[in-house]
């Protein structure tokens, strides 16, 4: 670790450890990670391709699904260069500007995903509670506005983070015990007070993920009331069945996020590898599982994918 003793280098770079202490088996660890990244890319690209090429899927529900797939793809590609760089080439140094850029995209896309999940819950609410006005409420123009507002809100709230980190002097260490750059990990290396960063980080989470999760819960409360008011048991099951994929996507996103938050807040005594694994679960499991869930649980998507593979054969 020459970087630890090279003062001039420390001023320009961070040092990513990956799975520290397991360097001799990094090539083996890379196999499941490569498989996950490949599956994420193929799965989400397939979803995007199917929705784009099939005119019958040009509906609000599938537009939102395309947004989710695009966000998952971006989140995967944000971490891929440094993760595989460490495993394959032992490339552990990352310039501070590059690190802050990666941090910006990871956190922005995480917030975009939360916002897209909220938009999808609104879609389900309108489809079940106000089906006759579904196409007039969720017009293509309005869907585009919802997508753009998700990106703008997330980007504008995350944009200050690199500047808040840039003002610090990192005199203790430039070693990040991760394979990518995260705000919480970088600010721990600062010599001066991090109270401003800490408060702003909590503010961002509260007004994005916090608000989104409450509104998703509210939408499903109203959906459940509407479903229970339906006359026949078959109608209730049909209505709930259209929500299963989205509920799975919500759980896949929020449960790892809550787990990661609990580990960061109360898991100081836990081995470092637990922190690492939780961060990988949070960033990789939703992009990995969302295409699988929607392919299995959404009949239209499943049928179109099967047709594509039959055509290839």
Regions found by a protein language model. Give the residues of each.
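Transmembrane helical core of 7TM receptor-like proteins
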Residues: 1-313
């Amino acid at each position: 670790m020459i970087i630890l003793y090279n003062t001039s280098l420390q001023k320009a770079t961070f040092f990513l450890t990956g799975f520290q202490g397991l360097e001799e088996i990094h090539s083996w660890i890379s196999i499941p990670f490569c498989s996950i990244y490949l599956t994420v890319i193929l799965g989400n690209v397939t979803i995007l391709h199917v929705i784009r090429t099939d005119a019958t899927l040009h509906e609000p529900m599938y537009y939102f699904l395309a947004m989710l797939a695009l966000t998952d793809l971006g989140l995967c590609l944000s971490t891929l260069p440094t993760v595989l760089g460490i495993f394959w080439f032992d490339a552990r140094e990352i310039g501070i500007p590059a690190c802050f850029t990666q941090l910006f995209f990871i956190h922005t896309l995480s917030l975009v995903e939360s916002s897209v999940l909220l938009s999808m819950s609104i879609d389900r609410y309108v489809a079940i509670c106000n089906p006759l006005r579904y196409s007039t409420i969720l017009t293509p123009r309005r869907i585009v506005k919802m997508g753009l507002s998700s990106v703008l809100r997330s980007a504008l709230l995350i944009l200050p983070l690199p500047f808040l980190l840039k003002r610090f002097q990192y005199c203790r260490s430039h070693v990040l015990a991760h394979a990518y750059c995260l705000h919480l990990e970088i600010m721990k290396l600062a010599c001066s007070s991090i109270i401003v960063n800490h408060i702003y980080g909590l503010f961002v989470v509260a007004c994005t993920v916090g608000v989104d999760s409450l509104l998703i819960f509210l939408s499903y409360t109203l959906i459940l009331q509407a479903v229970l008011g339906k006359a026949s048991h078959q109608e209730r099951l049909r209505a709930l069945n259209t929500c299963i994929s989205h509920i799975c996507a919500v759980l896949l996103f929020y449960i790892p996020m809550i787990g990661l938050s609990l580990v960061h807040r109360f898991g100081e005594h836990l081995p470092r590898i637990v922190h690492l694994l939780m961060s990988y679960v949070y960033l990789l499991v939703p992009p990995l599982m969302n295409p699988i869930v929607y392919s299995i649980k959404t009949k239209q998507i499943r049928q179109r994918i099967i047709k594509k593979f039959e055509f290839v054969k």
